[in-house]
């Protein structure tokens, strides 16, 4: 029963568009009643109807330590006692900035903001200001927040000017946004051949987390770095999702690629609203007040958020933190795949440390956006609701990644696998294929 959630959802729709403050939370992609959460602890969510869920959303990525981690809660509580916001510098800004740079050597200086969207938007403004160029390249299926210039859908043509994918975004705003095909270096090279003197930057997720989960091919990222070097453009890694999750040094450390700028978010706030962007010293020095490129924020560097973020990042230095997290992720994903194969369910998966994507398809490994969107969304909807009914909370969209935290143990993973095995064993015939 979800009586209280249903009542709250009905009430919320009177006061908020769609009843939510971020569209995916409304369950529009899967149908049904969104769960209103009243408490979270470790790997669990508890909704207002007192139902407990094993959580594989993790607030969409920030909760790498699990919910209500004692060290993070203590740090935030202590900070609150000294005031909620100063509008002036505080020492923890310096400490967090230094730790970010220690973890990610490509970030020689960093600017704190309030969200991943602010981080990518500001990084692009800085890239345009530094290069004196206006055009940017992004990739079909990659999501970099809701800034106007990044809300672009290129349709079937890779080598086209962007078209707005939301009303309210002026055509002129996105005409300088070029869209290429993820993991297709030729599509990027063709854009440089045509607009070589106009391209300020490439922005890319090294592991794309919003077309389910698709890792970049190593030679693809190497090629992007070489093209930027050749044409004098900047390479921006959007590591809002992957930063400090897939490795302490982010995805850039796994690929051994040094971007010019990096956008961060999610984990660096420990659950508080924080974003950041940083990179080469000479580029960051072009930001106001040192340089001419303007960016500011009333709540940037908020003392409570800085304390929570600093406490979170300190926990990531624990011995074997990432090897343990990767092992749990692999245990979960390989367990899901083996059960799908045994039940003849058409399912494939991609995963990295602490993050995974499941796609209902018989095509094999998914490496491009076009494959991801061809996954069977109806199969996912059925799977999602069966998991939810059995106490497992997945992202309510077939195109969103799942997250696992340090608080998940083999107990939660194995219980999840038992639930999946049971779901697959009794699934409708339409879910099955011949293998």
From Swiss-Prot:
Keywords: Cytoplasm, Isomerase, Porphyrin biosynthesis, Pyridoxal phosphate. CDD domains: OAT_like. Gene3D superfamilies: Aspartate Aminotransferase, domain 1, Type I PLP-dependent aspartate aminotransferase-like (Major domain). GO terms for molecular function: glutamate-1-semialdehyde 2,1-aminomutase activity; pyridoxal phosphate binding; transaminase activity. Its main location: cytoplasm. Pathway: Porphyrin-containing compound metabolism; protoporphyrin-IX biosynthesis; 5-aminolevulinate from L-glutamyl-tRNA(Glu): step 2/2. Pfam families: Aminotran_3. Its cofactor is pyridoxal 5'-phosphate. It is found in: Cytoplasm. It comes from the Bacteria. SUPFAM superfamilies: PLP-dependent transferases (SSF53383). GO terms for biological process: protoporphyrinogen IX biosynthetic process. It catalyses: (S)-4-amino-5-oxopentanoate = 5-aminolevulinate. The modification N6-(pyridoxal phosphate)lysine is found at residue 266. GO terms for cellular component: cytoplasm. InterPro entries: 4pyrrol_synth_GluAld_NH2Trfase, Aminotrans_3, Aminotrans_3_PPA_site, PyrdxlP-dep_Trfase, PyrdxlP-dep_Trfase_major, PyrdxlP-dep_Trfase_small. Its EC number is 5.4.3.8. Homodimer. Belongs to the class-III pyridoxal-phosphate-dependent aminotransferase family. HemL subfamily. HAMAP family: HemL_aminotrans_3. NCBIfam families: hemL (TIGR00713), PRK00062.1 (NF000818). This is Glutamate-1-semialdehyde 2,1-aminomutase. It comes from Coxiella burnetii (strain CbuG_Q212) (Coxiella burnetii (strain Q212)).
